[in-house]
Each structure stands twice: as structure tokens, then as C-alpha cells.
UniProtKB/Swiss-Prot annotation:
Pfam families: DUF478 (PF04334)
Protein name: Uncharacterized kinetoplast minicircle 51 polypeptide
Gene source species: Trypanosoma brucei brucei
Key word Mitochondrion present: yes
Keywords: Kinetoplast, Mitochondrion
GO cellular component, one term: kinetoplast
Subcellular location: Mitochondrion matrix, Kinetoplast
Domain of life per record: Eukaryota
InterPro entries with a match to the protein in the record: DUF478
Taxon lineage: Eukaryota, Discoba, Euglenozoa, Kinetoplastea, Metakinetoplastina
Length: 71
């Protein structure tokens, strides 16, 4: 699914989101775990798909909550 070609760009993308959003410490930990899973540990890729889905779901919930708090 093209996961390995993003092995080293994922940390950059999600760290960028972390910086731009100015997220809380808890969400920072979530994003850190997200790209740590893809840091070249191919033996973990089999069970990492549910981690990706979970992190995207949590990130979406956080972004929606932050949008409500700004308005």
C-alpha cells in the first residue's frame, strides 16, 4: 500500500501538524507513536494498520474539538 515509501516522510508530516496546531501534550504523544510505528520497523507493519486508523480517528476528533473552541 505504499507504506514503506513514506517511512521517513511520515514523521515530518505529522510533526508539522503537531507544530502548526500547537496541540496539547497528550495529542503530541499520539502523533509521536503514529510515526514511531513507521520508522523502518517492518516487523510491526502487520499490526500497525489498526494503529493508523485509531490515530487518524483521534486526530480528527481533536481537530474538530479545537475548531469548536476557537469559534
Amino acid at each position: 500500500m505504499g507504506v514503506q515509501k513514506y517511512t521517513y516522510t511520515n514523521p515530518v508530516l505529522f510533526w508539522g501538524i503537531f507544530e502548526v496546531r500547537g496541540t496539547s501534550k497528550g495529542v503530541g504523544v499520539i502523533l509521536t507513536r503514529f510515526f514511531w510505528v513507521f520508522s523502518g520497523r517492518e516487523r510491526v507493519l502487520k499490526r500497525s494498520s489498526y494503529i493508523v486508523i485509531l490515530n487518524l480517528w483521534l486526530l480528527r476528533g481533536f481537530l474538530e474539538a479545537s475548531d469548536y473552541s476557537e469559534s
